């Protein structure tokens, strides 16, 4: 099901929910309107400049003390390095490869997030990062 189709389906099943569409880089939502934001295997789809805009938007949308939780690609350990490279070559774009070269926790700190914590998963091929908007 395409994203718009999924949104239509959700609207039919839950007519009381408000539907908001926009770009992750500049969402049409109020500042400090969320206590938590989750980004799951999405950031690697954005070029670096747009990825920074997405993260700045997340910081803007979080209320003070609010949490960002994200899961995305990380350079794999020795056993999964070749499979990860093959997967990226066959199924991903250059943006995924670029993300594997970057230090996402440091990027989050430079953007103004605090309490940044990283956990490596799946043979180091994925990372789960939590961070907060300072109070």
Residue ranges and their predicted role:
Residues 1-26:
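Class I SAM-dependent methyltransferase SAM/SAH-binding core
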Residues 25-37:
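A short acidic, Gly/Pro-enriched loop at the edge of an enzyme's catalytic core
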Residues 33, 66-67:
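Surface-exposed loop/turn positions
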Residues 35-49:
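A short SAM/SAH-binding and catalytic strip from SAM-dependent methyltransferases
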Residues 52, 67-111, 115-128:
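C-terminal alpha-helical "lid/dimerization" subdomain adjacent to the S-adenosyl-L-methionine
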Residues 52-64:
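A short glycine-rich, Lys/Arg-flanked "PGG" loop and its adjoining helix->strand segment in the class I
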Residues 129-135:
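C-terminal lobe and adjacent flexible extensions of AdoMet/dcAdoMet transferase-like proteins
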């Amino acid at each position: 099901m395409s994203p718009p189709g999924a949104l239509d389906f959700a609207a039919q099943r839950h007519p009381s929910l408000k539907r908001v569409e926009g770009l992750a880089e500049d969402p049409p939502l109020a500042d400090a309107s969320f206590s938590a934001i989750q980004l799951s295997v999405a950031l690697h789809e954005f070029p670096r400049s747009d990825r920074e805009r997405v993260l700045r938007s997340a910081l803007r949308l979080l209320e003070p003390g609010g949490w960002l939780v994200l899961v995305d690609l990380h350079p794999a350990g020795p056993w999964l390095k070749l499979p990860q490279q093959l997967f990226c070559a066959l199924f991903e774009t250059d943006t995924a490869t670029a993300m594997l070269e970057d230090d996402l926790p440091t990027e989050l700190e430079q953007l103004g997030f605090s309490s940044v914590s990283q956990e490596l998963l799946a043979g180091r091929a994925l990372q789960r990062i939590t961070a907060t908007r300072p109070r």
